[in-house]
Design a protein with these regions (language model features):
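Short, contiguous strand/loop micro-motifs
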Residues: 47-48, 85, 328, 383-385, ...
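N-terminal cofactor/phosphate-binding cores enriched in small/glycine residues
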Residues: 27-29, 39, 45, 50-53, ...
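Acidic/histidine-rich, surface-exposed loop or edge segments in extracytoplasmic proteins
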Residues: 76-81
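Membrane-embedded transmembrane helical bundles of large multi-pass transporters/channels
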Residues: 1-42, 148-426, 547-735
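Structured non-transmembrane domains adjacent to transmembrane bundles in polytopic membrane proteins
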Residues: 54-72, 84-179, 425-615
Length: 735
């Protein structure tokens, strides 16, 4: 896009007339969107399936629901515990509570085991061996949302409070000789997961706004300027959320609380960056031009192209998530890319309008002036003239990289490579419970079950086979499989007796990798048993949480294998189109990839060795990769484009020093703010977001302080004129 076009855009959005019109359009647009479109929060769907209907565990669940309707429903496991042992009075009250649930079911309750009809000796047989724990099963409607289940469990606790005098759901698990109750199982876990993200939204928004405000005040020391990016981001947020609400209402897209939380961070982090690139250039230009509109035109012309390319790069990379088969990843694509698009438009229209309105006053009390204006101002005030001097720190950093490229390259490569080596040691988990705080009710309930019964009892899996009435050695063969605790007697379907279901309890945590690794063995055993009986081995289905987690792991790994090359390819093509250099495209992509693996490795050191976490969430690599690579390439684009422009008039060595010097301050500020916004995620009680925020923040910081000022300039210097190949946008002297 030519400078004349940028000049026209600058006039249209930031000129004397255009600035007020642009601001008015934004205000009217946001008001209209807020008044006439639904809120995004009203149409978030935290119960949206992550797996496609064709996945084996989903097919198995459908077969189970059709053939064994009595088992249809989401289990809520009410765990009763007394450290000194459950008393007869406790069990009698549990029976009374069971009777209450049977006579007055809570909302969305399907069935509840009638423990009140069991003789006390029979009931005692279901208590744990140490006599401390009892599990009461209530099946909830599988179509109920997490919010509906939350209301149901609130009602359940009220019923319990009327039955038990000491309010067992409110008691601390560590209490001595006190009856304690917790709701866990798939239903309880679902409710806690949703509540965690719901509680995170407000605190995340407030924390992010405060952090960005503090950073801006420290960097620019101007209250007006600190508010301009926040206003731009705020308007973008108010515009994007109702649009998402409309798309959700119409069923065009699906999104959840997790996506909205990360979108908030993305808007404030990336959005503030885009604003800063323009603001910093505008401030610099005001030291050379008396007319603020002339200064703005030049600043806009020098940054708008890079901002637009940066925005489109991130947006396109995020849209690639649409190819993901795993629901949570796929559902990020539209909210994230739409937020970046609107934020980019805001930074190129609303920010110029605000700068046009406030002009130099934007930077009060440290107003940038030309030398002549500074002398005139000092004379009026009777003060000594303060001539503006550019900060030379980043220029000196650029000189180090340009004058000592080999040393710089080797040192930075050793630092980043050393961190990246730890990425090979990372262990992953797909255990939903491990992402919860230890004091969450469902996790406390699971811990009680695991400690006193066995982890496998939390979520047994179900094996369904179609035997056509033939006898098989299924139960006997399954019991021989390592990792299986118990296998129930086969239960024929009440709808079609050709179908038989076996309930399998594992020795391991059903959400663990060890449990998931058993799925192929169980399937092979079942299929072999069917074949030995002369039956089709295709009529074998495995349902349950472990089977679902197994499919989730497989699908996310497939998504990683597809999305990562696509993102790399896309960014490479965009860089090639913008820089017209194959060489630069290759080493810029390579450096950002190195940033990602270094961040993953260093993040693992902190998470595993310092925080004591055994494994990180399995979704972290793909989450962090897209953000670190896409956002990290932003800084390379801004810096390398500056070097490219300087190299047309200066020798490459000087162009590198000038390019790093010119962009160093603003990129550092932007990097700190972006890393800070992602670091806000580490304050949340959700390990998935803590780990994602930490690793992404590390990646941004590595890119800001090592890759961009040292590694990339050093590589550019080492390549010399070949850094531009096959383009020729450089001076003939490269010394």
């Amino acid at each position: 896009m030519s400078n004349s076009i940028f000049s026209k855009i600058a006039n249209a959005v930031g000129g004397k007339k255009g600035r007020l019109i642009t601001l008015a359009i934004w205000i009217l647009l946001v008001i209209a969107l807020q008044l006439f479109l639904p809120k995004a929060a009203d149409y978030k769907d935290d119960a949206a399936p992550d797996l496609a209907a064709s996945e084996p565990s989903v097919v198995a669940q459908k077969v189970m629901d059709e053939q064994f309707p009595s088992g249809e429903g989401t289990p809520a496991l009410i765990t009763w515990y007394r450290s000194t042992g459950l008393t007869n009075a406790d069990l009698a009250q549990i029976q009374q509570f069971s009777k209450e649930l049977e006579q007055n079911p809570i909302k969305h309750q399907k069935t509840a085991v009638p423990y009140d009809k069991m003789p006390l000796p029979v009931l005692k047989q279901q208590v744990s061996e140490d006599g401390t724990t009892f599990i009461q099963t209530v099946l909830m409607d599988s179509s109920a949302t997490s919010d509906q289940l939350k209301d149901s469990f609130t009602e359940l606790e009220k019923t319990a409070n009327a039955t038990f005098s000491d309010k067992p759901f409110k008691q601390d698990v560590a209490s001595k000789d006190t009856l304690v109750a917790r709701t866990t199982g798939p239903a309880g876990i679902s409710v806690d997961a949703t509540e965690l993200f719901s509680d995170a939204d407000v605190s995340l928004l407030i924390g992010t706004v405060l952090l960005v405000l503090v950073f801006l005040l420290v960097i620019y020391r101007s209250p007006i300027l600190a508010l301009i990016p926040l206003i731009a981001v705020g308007f973008a947020y108010l515009a994007v959320t109702p649009i998402l609400g409309l798309l959700g209402q119409e069923g065009i897209i699906t999104y959840g609380s997790q996506g909205l939380s990360i979108m908030t961070v993305l808007l404030f982090g990336a959005g503030t960056d885009y604003c800063l690139f323009l603001i910093a250039r505008f401030r610099s230009q005001l030291h050379h031009d008396e007319n603020r509109y002339t200064a703005f035109k030049k600043a806009f012309g020098n940054t708008a192209g890079a901002i637009a390319l940066s925005g489109f790069t991130v947006m396109a990379a995020l849209l690639i998530l649409l190819v993901a088969k795993y629901g949570s990843i796929h559902n990020f694509a539209v909210p994230f890319s739409l937020s970046i698009l609107i934020m980019m438009i805001s930074s190129l229209t609303l920010v110029p309008a605000l700068l046009g309105i406030f002009g130099r006053i934007s930077f009060w009390p440290f107003v940038p002036r030309t030398e002549a204006m500074a002398k005139e101002h000092a004379t009026k005030k009777g003060k000594k003239v303060k001539i503006h001097r550019e900060n030379r720190f980043w220029h000196r950093v650029g000189e180090i990289s340009a004058h000592h490229p080999i040393k710089t390259f080797v040192i930075t490569l050793l630092i980043l490579g050393g961190c990246a080596l730890f990425a090979t040691q990372v262990k992953y988990t797909y255990d939903t419970l491990s992402t919860f705080p230890k004091d969450m009710p469902s996790r406390e309930g699971f811990t009680l079950i695991s400690d006193h019964f066995g982890a496998g009892q939390l979520a047994p899996m179900n094996l369904i086979v179609k035997t056509n009435g033939e006898k098989t050695a299924m139960r006997e063969n399954l019991q021989k499989t390592d990792g299986i605790e118990t296998v129930s007697v086969g239960v024929p379907s009440t709808k079609n007796r050709d179908y038989t279901m076996y309930t399998i309890q594992l020795t391991d945590n059903p959400y663990s990798n060890a449990a998931m690794d058993l799925i192929p063995d169980i399937r092979d055993t079942a299929q072999t048993t069917m074949s030995d009986a002369g039956l089709s081995k295709n009529n074998v289905w495995i349902a349950g949480q472990t089977a679902t987690q197994y499919d989730s792991r497989a699908v996310t790994k497939d998504d990683e294998a597809l999305i990562i090359p696509l993102v790399i390819g896309l960014i490479a093509l965009l860089l090639l189109a913008y820089l017209r250099s194959i060489t630069a495209m290759v080493y810029l992509v390579a450096t950002v990839l190195l940033s990602f693996f270094s961040a993953l490795g260093l993040g693992w050191v902190i998470i595993h060795y310092i925080m004591g976490t055994e494994a990180i969430a399995g979704l972290i690599p793909i989450y962090a990769f897209v953000f670190i690579v896409a956002l990290g390439e932003d800084y390379n684009i801004f810096m390398i484009s500056s070097i490219w422009k300087k190299s047309r008039e200066l020798p490459l060595r000087e162009a590198i020093a000038e390019g790093v010097g010119q962009t160093g301050g603003v990129i550092t500020s932007a990097g700190l703010i972006l890393a800070g916004t992602f670091a806000v995620l580490t304050t949340l009680p959700i390990q998935l977001l803590v780990q994602f925020g930490l690793i992404t923040a590390i990646g941004v910081l590595l890119d800001t302080f090592i890759v961009r000022p040292f590694l990339v300039p050093a590589i550019t210097m080492l390549f010399g004129k070949w850094a531009f190949w096959p383009g020729k946008g450089h001076n003939q002297e490269h010394k």
